[in-house]
Amino acid sequence: MARIAILTADIAIASDGVADYSRLLAAELARQGHEVLLIGLMQSSGQWVRYFNTDHQAELNPQQHWPERLERVRQLITDFNPGLVSFQYVCFSFGRYGLPIHIGRDIRQVIGDKPLELMAHELWTCISRPADMKTYLLGTLQQLNFRELLRQIRPQCVHVSNPAYVRLLERIGCRASVLPLFGNIPVTDVKDSWLSSFTDHLRLMIFGSIHPEWSPSPLMEKLVEFADSINRRLMIISAGSQGRGKDVWRNMVDQYQARIAFHALGRMDAGRVSALMNAADYGIATSPMSLIGKSGTAAAMLEHDMPVIVTRDEPCYSVGRVEPAEGYGRFIRLDDSFEMQMRKYLGQSREMQSRLPLVAKEIINILMK
């Protein structure tokens, strides 16, 4: 049995993807028999500390100023005495403009000499493409701030979600390895009866936020052509919040609704999402291929062993095109092999499996090194 402390910005339910990630990881580590302390450093209301699989308790004040909050965290860490601290980092969660200048110093002060694993969910802006001068300067400052973070926290290991980030960190002298994201949708073997009833349709699914830069064309035209070739109608559903991509969805419906049946189902419980994934023929990812590994929604579809169509293949700015980690999932690109890949995966049996248990075991393995 090990003791793990997980530090992140927020642990409230539905606050953001990293909060979901941290809570699920803590629960899985506890399921595997370990004791876990989970702390939301920046959380200003609600329960910002949780214990898993332990009798530890803490009296908390969510309205503390930052110095008082740090001292309370230091006391909690000292009392819990973890063998490893896992820091789940996103720059914009810890400071205005994504520049938390002293966060590394503060983290190292509260954990003392405990070994630390850094999971960098985001690095800095301007990664996917060049930007205007103001954004470029912000990204440059964030990169310098990240270098300082590494110097201050002295991590035992650094994890990222995708190979593009590994290359970016190599360029600043940091050795990192890929720890694949797990989805926040528990994997089931249930198929949604409503979606399954459309047996004469080719059923595609978009889950969660739609990237505002994603373009439905020419994918929609190719899908219509493929559906016609196998004598099926075409159906696209959206499950969950579309985020900043609501206008993309609305414009897509306006343009293609004469040839495609669209259904925006909105938010729903995780069990229904899993059932829809099991009933859909394909998933559609709106993130670029180079950064697909950092998409939690893509991770959920891939854990359900869905063939996932990726239309964006622009290079990752400054490191070029980067392929996903080997064996990460079944992808269909919008290239000359599109129809062949669509036919190959249609109706194939699936081997659904959550990555969460493997990720938790990898965290424990750090203690063994």
Task: Put a short name on every predicted segment.
Residues 8-13, 24-80, 241-245:
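N-terminal strand-loop element at the rim of the active site
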Residues 32, 335-369:
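A charged, aromatic-enriched C-terminal amphipathic alpha-helix characteristic of glycosyltransferases
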Residues 105-112, 135-157:
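Membrane-proximal helix-turn-helix segments that form the acceptor-binding/catalytic region
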Residues 117, 125-149, 164, 185-189:
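Nucleotide-sugar donor phosphate/pyrophosphate-binding loop at the beta->alpha transition
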Residues 148-207:
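Donor nucleotide-sugar binding/catalytic pocket of nucleotide-sugar-dependent glycosyltransferases
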Residues 185-187, 192, 196-251:
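Conserved catalytic-core segment of nucleotide-activated headgroup transferases in glycan assembly
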Residues 248-271:
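Nucleotide-activated donor-binding/catalytic signature segment of Leloir-type glycosyltransferases, i.e.
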Residues 277-292:
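Acidic donor-binding loop of glycosyltransferase active sites
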